[in-house]
């Protein structure tokens, strides 16, 4: 049998007719139309509940205590990992050099070097803070930290 355009038909079950609900008990989906009895889901706009609403029970965000805060200082200070300094040329490193190398985001006003990984070059940090471990690693590589 050859395939012809006028003989084409969709596969069985590929196209089903839309179920019409609420059109009499004979259809099997009359009266409540598949929504059950009463409750918010049976009503118009039902099932739309606010995020965090727990049915009248005191919600989790009100049961738990308030803790901590976001430091505005932390937002202004960028963290630079010590191994990232190896991307720069050996020598003097200041805040402008870190910004130029995209190691510090534009919103930051200060930077602090934190120890992670190894240092292979000699750096002189100027006007950039460093943790005790990072300072020791920079000095071990032959560099120095000038506040």
Curated annotation (Swiss-Prot):
Basic residues composition bias: residue spans: 34-47
Family matches, as InterPro entries: Ribosomal_uL15, Ribosomal_uL15/eL18, Ribosomal_uL15/eL18_sf, Ribosomal_uL15_bac-type, Ribosomal_uL15_CS
Entries under Gene3D superfamilies matching the protein: 3.100.10.10
Record's compositionally biased regions (Gly residues): 23-33
Pfam families with a match to the protein in the record: Ribosomal_L27A
GO function terms (MF aspect): rRNA binding; structural constituent of ribosome
Listed Basic and acidic residues bias regions: 1-20
Region (Disordered) location: 1-61
Cellular component terms per the entry's GO annotation: cytosolic large ribosomal subunit
SUPFAM superfamilies cross-referenced by the UniProt entry: Ribosomal proteins L15p and L18e
Keywords: Ribonucleoprotein, Ribosomal protein, RNA-binding, rRNA-binding
GO biological process: translation
Family indicated by similarity: Belongs to the universal ribosomal protein uL15 family.
Known role: Binds to the 23S rRNA.
Assembly and binders: Part of the 50S ribosomal subunit.
The protein, known as: Large ribosomal subunit protein uL15
Organism: Xanthomonas euvesicatoria pv. vesicatoria (strain 85-10)
Gene behind this protein: rplO
